[in-house]
Amino acid sequence: MQNRSLAPSITAEGRMSDKPDLPPPPHRPVAALQCYLAYLTSFVVGALTWWRLLESGTVEDPFWIGFIVTCVSTVAIWIFSIANDNSSIYDPYWVIAPPILALAFKATAGGGLLGDWSGRQVAVVACLWIWGIRYHTMYSWGGWRTGLVHEDWRYEEMRAAPVPYWLNSLLGMHLFPTVLVYFAFAPGILALVADPATQPPFGAWDALGVAGALTAVAIELFSDEQLRKFRETDAYHNGVAMRQGLWKYSRHPNYFGEVLFWLSMIPFAIPVGALAARPALVLAGPVAMAIFFRFSCWLMDVRSLARRPNYQQVVDEVSAMVPWVPKS
């Protein structure tokens, strides 16, 4: 999802959060209790929707069951966002949803959640939980602790769009990132719902997926920590661009880490035959995520060029996203 930018819910450094890059716009505060209630409601509504779809048999494909569920859960969050006039209530959803959905998908596969797990299923679920825990450990959302005292500045800008705010909030601030992350997760979903009894054991493709996902998490971890420390320096507050650590080789290494994580889901889909059977579904989401973040790099560069005097030199010398040797 990180990470993140293009999506109004992904911040300047690739994370959905309420980072103070700019002075927070005055908005209606949201109590922590409201944030907890929003996510409890979202979870209950999602679980009931999943159960109802399974019971009715109206949708048989687990992938599309999950898609409907995550969209319905997102709408539940959106209702709280509109009721509280603050769309930042949605901010952590895109990281919370995939690990929980992963367990739900395993429960629908052969053997259920408490039955036998294949090495592949363990790997996919473990990678998602490591990814999610890393994010929530480094970016403790204020909504859980003290509530929200402001709304993300991107949402503030989108309020000026020539469309009704409620519609812009629903489609652009809530459903768009939900759908993007869900389809990026598609290869992992197809690997999870495959019956372990009929699939090959953990192999080279799975090892590649694990290696890629863990490398991605490490890149995000180090780049975010390096940026956090830099934000505490006088250089940052004086408008100097970050050019240390991984940021020496990429203007947005955390974006690269997020893209790499979702691309790393693709190898898990290969041994179960999903890539051969449903290539568009396996590839479209991760590729769309890569395109999304690449365009996000451009948007953030435009903003940095207006705010940081030396940033044009960074653009000229440092790779936009993929780490590479600087030109000088």
Named regions from a protein language model:
Residues 86-100, 148-172, 240-247, 320:
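Juxtamembrane helix-capping/reentrant segments at transmembrane boundaries
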Residues 135-155:
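Active-site neighborhood of divalent metal-dependent phosphoester bond hydrolases
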Residues 75-84, 94, 102:
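Conserved donor-binding loop and adjoining core beta-sheet/short helix segment
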Residues 9-28:
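Short, Lys/Arg-rich, polar N-terminal cytosolic tail immediately upstream
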Residues 23-74, 98-141, 176-226, 231-328:
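Hydrophobic transmembrane alpha-helices
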Residues 81-88, 114:
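Membrane-interface helix caps and helix-loop-helix hairpins in membrane proteins
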